[in-house]
């Protein structure tokens, strides 16, 4: 079967924003204008097509990145049909894992900002993730019809807060209730959309007289940015020649693809203005799969690097980036094809797990409606039904040409709670439900506490765990009692010590003999976490016993010493010891290693580390004193304050243990007018009084 859309007409994009910037409405409008969706879904009444999980409808926030396919030929039908695959990304900080995951499979992104709120803390996190994966992006300043909307202020914030180089290619005509359209700076024309048909048609008009000067200024700024793309354009520009419309677009595209500039558009999705022109910008300035670097992978045996180009002729390779459970068809594995072609019914290799998988049915999703297709090709995003072993981040590839595309890195959870099923019947169902949820979301962990036999779940924040418990109830009908949230503390040391460990047993028959000297030293935080060195010379301990010493130390690391929390940031070297020809064994050296580590650890100035969160609170000015006072009471350190159009943003670092129930407290302090966002920043040493309380409560259990 031949390719319907040439790969150069593909755009794999993400739409990314913080909560309430209007991302879901923007996506809805895209689906409307691309002709897929005929009735506009409004988030206000919970009917948005992209928000297809039930709690998203209730909370009005987007949780799962659903992938949707749409076609666009331009506002004035000026392009050949382009296929736009949209990955919807969540804006809430507890779901950064989803954002990270979708950034991995995108070629470009549209960053949606609120014209009133501007660049929010969450936008900065998403921006950093987009930088990490070198994703070219354009900005869409939404909500131009709202009170306090200011387009150029947001442009300035993109520059100062994100350290980016914004280049507006449009200006807003009016703002708030007087917002009527946009000026296209490339054509130097005003665009007005027809309100009667929800913006499906439009007309060009002359630039309003009172905006002529401003438009000229920003047009020059844009042309200068375009001219910097090449010497040829620069010479023409400096020689006083006018750049043609084509040359301006070509220059802007080249620089946007290299991430040197970020093109800024504006509008109001709710009022059906601007999304249409932003879609044109997606086609003109964001990359096709062939415009981005070929993906690098490794061949398993020797780690030899391999490259896969976005071509149908190359061997098949794809990355599974999301697992979702569909009530009707079971497991859906969303994957992005980087090279080659795969047909339904083909058998492929899951190279990370080393297992073969049969691709049953392939579907393309339109939010949560499914369209079954027979094949997918390089550049496509689709979902396979019924893959058994694939988890997020796995590579699927041609059996004859194995490759592992880079693994995604997932953060460690910072908060855990105990779960108790309400009835005996729930017990078994809970195990199945948690297994499914953990497969979908790698930042969510499940284990059984050995002492209490309780099931423990851990994740990236309170909201993250709330939603997972909620999903268990809705999707799997499992009712559970949830314990108090527990903070994931860590243990480490502050000085270097040397410690002997001796394990000798003589009780008739063969004895046990293991004897080691360990040097235990602190490592830089945030590095490897644990390093083991073998410094034995002259065979005082035979080589075959060294891994057993390492194993003994590692078991102790896992169980902790001070208060049974995992130990991090230590280097352990075994440098001396002795053995017995008959009595020495692996188990004896394992025990000796564990004993030496445990004793040495307590002499090496052990400390407890606690997770510190980065908090940003937006509050009206009159509550600022209360908010700061409250953060100080929570052992917070205030980093700084910014003015916003509606008050102040306070930036602080606060221990996670002090943040439980903060949402409720903040609401009551500010009569519901303040909002906050929180993300994990780092581990740092807990004060002595806090450590003492935690250690005592852990050791009395």
UniProtKB/Swiss-Prot annotation:
Name of protein: Elongation factor G
NCBIfam families per record: EF-G (TIGR00484), PRK12740.1-5 (NF009381), small_GTP (TIGR00231)
What SUPFAM superfamilies does UniProt report for this protein, alphabetically?
Answer: EF-G C-terminal domain-like, P-loop containing nucleoside triphosphate hydrolases, Ribosomal protein S5 domain 2-like, Translation proteins
What are the tr-type G domain coordinates in residue numbering?
8-290
InterPro entries assigned to the protein according to its UniProt record, in alphabetical order: EFG_II, EFG_III, EFG_III/V, EFG_IV, EFG_V, EFG_V-like, EFTu-like_2, G_TR_CS
Please classify the protein's predominant subcellular localization into one broad category. cytoplasm
User: Which positions in this protein are listed as binding GTP?
Assistant: 17-24, 88-92, 142-145
Q: Quick check: keyword GTP-binding in the entry? A: yes
Per the UniProt entry, what are the Gene Ontology biological process annotations, in alphabetical order?
ribosome disassembly
Q: Name one GO cellular component term.
A: cytoplasm
């Amino acid at each position: 079967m031949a390719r319907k859309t040439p790969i150069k007409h593909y755009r794999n994009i993400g739409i990314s924003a913080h909560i309430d910037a209007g991302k879901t409405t923007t996506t809805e409008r895209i689906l409307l204008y691309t002709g897929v969706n005929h009735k506009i879904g409004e988030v206000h009444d919970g009917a948005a097509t992209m928000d297809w999980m039930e709690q998203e409808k209730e909370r009005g926030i987007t949780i799962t990145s659903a992938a949707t396919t749409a076609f666009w030929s331009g506002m004035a039908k000026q392009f050949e049909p382009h296929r736009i695959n949209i990955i919807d990304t969540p804006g809430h900080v507890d779901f950064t894992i989803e954002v990270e995951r979708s950034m991995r499979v995108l070629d470009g992104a549209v960053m949606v900002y609120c014209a009133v709120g501007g660049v929010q803390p969450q936008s900065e996190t998403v921006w950093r993730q987009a930088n990490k994966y070198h994703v070219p992006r354009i900005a869409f300043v939404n909500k131009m019809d709202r009170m306090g909307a200011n387009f150029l202020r947001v442009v300035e914030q993109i520059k100062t807060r994100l350290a980016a180089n914004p280049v507006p290619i449009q200006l807003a005509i009016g703002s708030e209730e007087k917002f009527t359209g946009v000026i296209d700076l490339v054509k130097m024309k005003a665009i007005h959309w027809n309100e009667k048909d929800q913006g499906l048609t439009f007309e060009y008009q002359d630039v309003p007289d009172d905006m002529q000067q401003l438009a000229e200024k920003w047009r020059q700024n844009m042309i200068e940015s375009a001219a910097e793309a090449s010497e040829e354009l620069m010479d023409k520009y400096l020689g006083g020649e006018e750049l043609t419309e084509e040359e301006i677009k070509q220059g802007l595209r080249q620089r946007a693809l290299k991430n040197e500039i970020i093109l800024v558009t504006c509008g109001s999705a709710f009022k059906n203005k601007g999304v249409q022109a932003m879609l044109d910008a997606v086609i003109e300035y964001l990359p096709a799969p062939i415009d981005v670097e070929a993906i690098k992978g490794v061949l398993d045996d020797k780690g030899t690097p391999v490259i896969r180009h976005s071509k149908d002729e190359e061997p098949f390779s794809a990355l599974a980036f999301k697992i979702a459970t569909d009530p009707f068809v079971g497991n859906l594995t969303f994957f992005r094809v980087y090279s080659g072609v795969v047909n339904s019914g083909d058998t492929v290799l899951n190279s990370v797990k080393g297992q073969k998988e049969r691709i049953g049915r392939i579907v393309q999703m339109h939010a949560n409606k499914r369209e079954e297709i027979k094949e997918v090709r390089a550049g496509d995003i689709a979902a396979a039904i019924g893959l058994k072993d694939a988890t997020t981040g796995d590579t699927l590839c041609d059996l004859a040409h194995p490759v592992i595309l880079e693994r995604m890195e997932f953060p460690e959870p910072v908060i855990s709670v105990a779960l108790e099923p309400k009835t005996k019947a729930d017990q078994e169902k809970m195990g199945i439900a948690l297994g499914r949820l953990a497969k979908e979301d790698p930042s969510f962990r499940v284990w059984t506490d050995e002492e209490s036999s309780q099931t423990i779940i851990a994740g990236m924040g309170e909201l993250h765990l709330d939603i997972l418990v909620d999903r268990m109830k809705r999707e799997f009908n499992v009712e559970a009692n949830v314990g108090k949230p527990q903070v994931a503390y860590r243990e480490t040391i502050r000085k270097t010590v040397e410690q002997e460990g001796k394990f000798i047993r003589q009780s008739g028959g063969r004895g046990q003999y293991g004897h080691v000297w360990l040097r235990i030293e602190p490592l830089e935080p945030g590095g490897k976490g644990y390093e083991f060195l073998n410094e034995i010379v002259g065979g005082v301990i035979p080589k075959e016993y060294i891994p057993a010493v390492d194993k003994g130390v590692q078991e102790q690391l896992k169980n902790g010493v001070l208060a049974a929390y995992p130990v991090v940031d230590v280097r352990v070297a075994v440098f001396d010891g002795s053995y017995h020809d008959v009595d020495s064994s692996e188990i004896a050296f394992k025990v000796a290693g564990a004993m030496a580590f445990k004793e040495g650890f307590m002499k090496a100035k052990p400390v407890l580390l606690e997770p510190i969160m980065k908090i940003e609170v937006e509050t009206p000015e009159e509550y600022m004193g209360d908010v700061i006072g409250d953060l100080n009471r929570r052992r917070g350190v205030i980093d700084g304050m910014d003015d916003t159009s509606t008050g102040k943003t306070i930036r602080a670092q606060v221990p996670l243990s002090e943040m439980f129930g903060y949402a409720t407290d903040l609401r009551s302090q500010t009569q519901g007018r303040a909002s906050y966002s929180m993300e994990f920043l780092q581990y740092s040493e807990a004060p002595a009084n806090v450590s003492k309380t935690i250690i005592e409560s852990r050791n009395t259990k």
